[in-house]
Swiss-Prot record:
<dbReference type="GO" id="GO:0000139">
    <property type="term" value="C:Golgi membrane"/>
</dbReference>
<keyword id="KW-0406">Ion transport</keyword>
<feature type="transmembrane region" description="Helical">
    <location>
        <begin position="369"/>
        <end position="389"/>
    </location>
</feature>
<dbReference type="GO" id="GO:0006882">
    <property type="term" value="P:intracellular zinc ion homeostasis"/>
</dbReference>
<comment type="function">
    <text>Functions as a zinc transporter transporting Zn(2+) from the Golgi apparatus to the cytosol and thus influences the zinc level at least in areas of the cytosol. May regulate beige adipocyte differentiation.</text>
</comment>
<keyword id="KW-0256">Endoplasmic reticulum</keyword>
<dbReference type="GO" id="GO:0061448">
    <property type="term" value="P:connective tissue development"/>
</dbReference>
<dbReference type="GO" id="GO:0005789">
    <property type="term" value="C:endoplasmic reticulum membrane"/>
</dbReference>
<feature type="transmembrane region" description="Helical">
    <location>
        <begin position="402"/>
        <end position="422"/>
    </location>
</feature>
<keyword id="KW-0333">Golgi apparatus</keyword>
<keyword id="KW-1133">Transmembrane helix</keyword>
<feature type="topological domain" description="Lumenal">
    <location>
        <begin position="1"/>
        <end position="15"/>
    </location>
</feature>
<feature type="transmembrane region" description="Helical">
    <location>
        <begin position="279"/>
        <end position="299"/>
    </location>
</feature>
<dbReference type="GO" id="GO:0005385">
    <property type="term" value="F:zinc ion transmembrane transporter activity"/>
</dbReference>
<feature type="transmembrane region" description="Helical">
    <location>
        <begin position="150"/>
        <end position="170"/>
    </location>
</feature>
<feature type="topological domain" description="Cytoplasmic">
    <location>
        <begin position="130"/>
        <end position="149"/>
    </location>
</feature>
<feature type="transmembrane region" description="Helical">
    <location>
        <begin position="16"/>
        <end position="36"/>
    </location>
</feature>
Length: 423
C-alpha cells in the first residue's frame, strides 16, 4: 500500500528496537546488581567493624580491666624479685671479687646457681612441657611420641642458639688474654685459677677486650631469663582469667620459686663482670618479658572470639585437680557455668546440665607454650654446663670442691622442695 512502510524495513527496525531495549535492560540489571553487591559489601564491612569494636570493648570491659590490672601487677611482682639478691649478697661483694675471699664466695654462689639452673630445667620447665604435651595430645601414642621428640629438638635448638650467639660475640684470643691477666692480688688470682699461682704475668688486655668478652655469658643469661619471665607472665595472666584466687596463688608460687633462682642468676651476672647495682638493674629489666607474656595471654582470649584458652597455662600451674582432669572446686563455676550473676545470668552449679567442656586453647597460645619451655630449658642448660661448670672444675682443693658439690646439691634440693610443696 502507498502509505505503509516497507515490510522488510519494518522488521529490521523492530529487531533493532528489540536489541536496543534488551541491551538497555542488561546494562540496567548489571548496574543494579553491581550496586547491590556494593551495598552488601558495605553492610558486611559494617558488621565486621561492629564485631571488632564489640570484641575490643569486651577486652577493655570492667571485669576484663580488673584482670588486666591484676595480671600486670602479678607479673611485675615476679619481675621485682630480681632485687632480692641485694638483700642476700653483702654490699661489698661487687668490689671484693678480686680478693681471695671474694673469689671463693663467688664460686660458692656459682655452685648454688648451677644446682638451681639444673633443678629449674629438669624439675620445673621440662616436666611442665612434658605434661602439657601429654594433655594436648589426642592422636594416640604415636602422636604423643612425636610431640615428645619435638620437645627434645626444641631443647637442642635452644642449646645451639645460645652457642651460636656466644660464638658471634666471642673473641677467643681476647678471652685467653683476659683469663691470664694478672690480678692485683696474687691470692685472688690463684683462687680463680684452681689454686695455682701464675708462673709469669701476662700482658694486661685493653679495657674494651675485657668488657666485650667477660659479659657475653651474662647477656645470654639475661636473654634466657627474659624468655623464662615471658612464660611466667603467661601463667599469671591465664590464672587470673580463671579467678582472682587462682591468680594470687599462682603469683605466690612463682615468686617463691623465683627467689632462689634470682640469687643464682645474680651470681652469674657478677661472674660475667657486672657490678652489684648494674646486675640488679639488668635483672629488673627482664621483668618486661613477664609483662609481655601477660599481655599476650589476655589478648589471645578476647578479640575476634578466640575462646577462653585458660587451660594452657592455668592447668600447668595446678588449676585442675591433679590426675582427674576435673576442675578444682574453687574454679569449677567459672569454667563450666557461664558468666557470673549480673553479667548475663548463669548459676554456679556442678556438674552443669548438660556438661560443657572447657574450650580448646587458642592456637597462638598453644604454639607458644609448645616450644618456649623446652627452648628456654636448652638455653639454661647451655649457661649451666658451658659457662658455670668449667669454673667450678678448676678447683683443686678437696675441701672447697666438697663445699661446691654440697652447695650444688643444695640448689637442687631447694628446687625439689618448691616443686613438691608449692606447685
Amino acid at each position: 500500500m502507498p502509505g505503509c512502510p516497507c515490510p522488510g524495513i519494518g522488521m529490521a527496525g523492530q529487531r533493532l528496537l528489540f536489541l536496543a531495549a534488551l541491551a538497555l535492560e542488561l546494562l540496567g540489571g548489571a548496574g543494579g546488581s553491581q550496586q547491590a553487591l556494593r551495598s552488601r559489601g558495605v553492610a558486611a564491612a559494617c558488621r565486621l567493624d561492629s564485631k571488632e569494636s564489640e570484641s575490643w570493648g569486651a577486652l577493655l570491659s570492667g571485669e576484663r580491666l580488673e584482670t588486666w590490672i591484676c595480671s600486670l601487677l602479678g607479673s611485675l611482682m615476679v619481675g621485682l624479685s630480681g632485687v632480692f639478691p641485694l638483700l642476700v649478697i653483702p654490699l661489698e661483694m661487687g668490689t671484693t671479687l678480686r680478693s681471695e675471699a671474694g673469689a671463693r664466695r663467688l664460686k660458692q654462689l656459682l655452685s648454688f646457681a648451677l644446682g638451681g639452673l639444673l633443678g629449674n630445667v629438669f624439675l620445673h620447665l621440662l616436666p611442665e612441657a612434658w605434661a602439657y604435651t601429654n594433655s594436648a595430645s589426642s592422636g594416640g601414642e604415636r602422636q604423643s611420641l612425636q610431640q615428645q621428640q619435638q620437645l627434645g629438638l626444641w631443647v637442642i635448638a635452644g642449646f645451639l642458639t645460645f652457642l651460636v650467639l656466644e660464638k658471634l660475640f666471642f673473641d677467643s684470643k681476647g678471652k685467653e688474654e683476659t683469663s691470664q691477666a694478672p690480678s692485683k692480688d696474687p691470692a685472688a688470682a690463684a683462687a680463680l685459677n684452681g689454686g695455682h699461682y701464675l708462673a709469669q704475668p701476662a700482658a694486661e688486655p685493653g679495657p674494651s677486650a675485657v668488657v666485650r668478652n667477660i659479659k657475653v655469658s651474662g647477656y645470654l643469661n639475661l636473654l634466657a631469663n627474659t624468655i623464662d619471665n615471658f612464660t611466667h607472665g603467661l601463667a599469671v595472666a591465664a590464672s587470673f582469667l580463671v579467678s582472682k584466687k587462682i591468680g594470687l596463688l599462682t603469683t605466690m608460687a612463682i615468686l617463691l620459686h623465683e627467689i632462689p633462682h634470682e640469687v643464682g642468676d645474680f651470681a652469674i651476672l657478677l661472674r660475667a663482670g657486672f657490678d652489684r647495682w648494674s646486675a640488679a638493674k639488668l635483672q629488673l629489666s627482664t621483668a618486661l618479658g613477664g609483662l609481655l607474656g601477660a599481655c599476650f595471654a589476655i589478648c589471645a582470649q578476647s578479640p575476634k572470639g578466640v575462646g577462653t584458652g585458660v587451660g594452657v597455662v592455668a592447668v600447668r600451674r595446678g588449676a585442675l585437680a591433679e590426675g582427674h582432669g576435673r576442675p578444682d572446686p574453687g574454679i569449677r563455676a567459672r569454667l563450666c557455668s557461664g558468666p557470673p550473676r549480673g553479667m548475663g545470668g548463669g548459676r554456679y552449679t556442678w556438674p552443669p546440665s548438660p556438661p560443657q567442656p572447657v574450650r580448646a586453647p587458642p592456637p597462638a597460645t598453644e604454639e607458644t607454650v609448645a616450644w618456649i619451655l623446652p627452648f628456654t630449658s636448652g638455653g639454661f642448660l647451655y649457661i649451666a654446663l658451658v659457662n658455670v661448670l668449667p669454673d667450678l672444675l678448676e678447683e683443686d682443693d678437696p675441701w672447697r670442691s666438697l663445699q661446691q658439690v654440697l652447695l650444688l646439691c643444695a640448689g637442687i634440693v631447694v628446687m625439689v622442695l618448691f616443686s613438691v610443696f608449692v606447685e
